[in-house]
């Protein structure tokens, strides 16, 4: 294999590792689940029932394989954006439902079995419990797609800043992030988010990345609607990873500037409020494979309140060491789909970052991570409703 082929293969592997891991993980869980069902609950079932179970498993494997092949062969790029997005989302949703169904079978087996000597009421209760277990996965995904995904709300969060200048006490900052305008989010949802933000009468309006999901999504429409944000000091922002994926970093910056929005790309904007200065800085998306915030420390302004906009929240420990008193981020969608068990929120995002949702502190420094507005991958939210965030600075 020559050098060119090896470079291409390495790039292909790195690009497809997340999807390959997801595909193999789901298929493995399905295979183990089917094997367990055939050996356990369906061991004495009729041949027709066992054949049906195997046929459904094969069909599921075929659908998941077809979706993965379409993706890695890049056939999906030739499909209409809405069909590509919803097709991929549906396959991911089915993967999620199928895994939950396997877990439901396990839970159902753990339930007591109805016996002839049991009362009719007990038999009915156990029957209802089994039905509820199997219906719950589909019901949860349906709720996430059709209800919670569209349940946009205002979230208010106070951020205590040690030694905050009195003229900055009570300063209101409104944040919109992870909009992902496209197949999964209509323009009217962006308009609604802007209307909610404007009702806060904020001093500063922020847009912290991922305006769209893919190349060809309606970026201009998103920018035009975001330009309707109103704030005393103006509209500022930073870019996210999807601006990079879509190749729109420069266009977003230039088109935003024409509309009155300033995207800060390794740059700072000192804002005066009375006798106080808020030094607002922003960085482009910080990649996992490179050191965070290289050279960003030089933007810190002594004597000012230093606030950093970074789409990726993982920069927080570095930002705190550099002297940024407050970091504002997005990227995680709050996990997008998460379940609370024993007062612990479980989500895929937990595997990638400690900073999933809300306010975190490290010494005197703080970071706020917003759940954002849109979705990616699967058009659903569960346990992580979309939000417009209103941040209030306050003295400790």
Q: Which residues does each PLM region occupy?
A:
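Non-catalytic terminal accessory segments
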Residues: 1-150
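Soluble catalytic domains of enzymes that build or remodel membrane lipids, polysaccharides, and related
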Residues: 155, 160, 164-396
